[in-house]
């Protein structure tokens, strides 16, 4: 998706922007004010993959940076993205691109393979202050023995459906773990809940 040098350059651009406007962690619609986020989200090779998954009529729904600071207890609990968005259809795919190394130590993503085929799972409210998931919910009925780690080098990406169960552990490394999270929808999809 661009390689290590490109990812490091994009990470530097993101950090320069952070110095000017503050934290970009989970700041919605980053592609509307950062050229580098737009360029990564709209790369031809990325859009070709997205087209193979949801068809040729693609809407760039959202772009956020997911940042875990070093030596942090922050984690993301098991969840499904589509639970929160109130969309008419589930023709959706998310790309998570590493801008820094995403290792087990730095809290790379974990997924439950084929879990998207089970549809929506029950989410429960959590009061865990170290859970950085904005909605504060978690799926508790997850068989973690079936989870796979998704380590990535800078510039590599994973793609997952919005019903895929996924989570990530704390970053116990000495470096920031930075990823670009991009959601794509088929254009026939519309918002049904706000």
Residue ranges and their predicted role:
Residues 1-78, 83-87, 124:
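Non-heme Fe(II)-dependent double-stranded beta-helix
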Residues 9-15, 157-159, 163-194:
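Non-heme Fe(II)/2-oxoglutarate
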Residues 9-14, 80, 129-146, 174-176, ...:
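Short, surface-exposed loop/helix-turn segments at secondary-structure junctions
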Residues 33, 61, 91, 105-107, ...:
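Residues that flank catalytic or metal-binding motifs in active/ligand-binding sites
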Residues 35-42, 88, 144-153, 173:
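Aromatic-acidic/polar surface patches that form glycan- and anion
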Residues 65-72, 82-83, 90-91, 99-104, ...:
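Short acidic/polar capping segments at secondary-structure boundaries
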Residues 79, 86-104, 151-154, 159, ...:
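Short, conserved beta-strand element in jelly-roll/cupin
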Residues 102-169, 189:
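Double-stranded beta-helix
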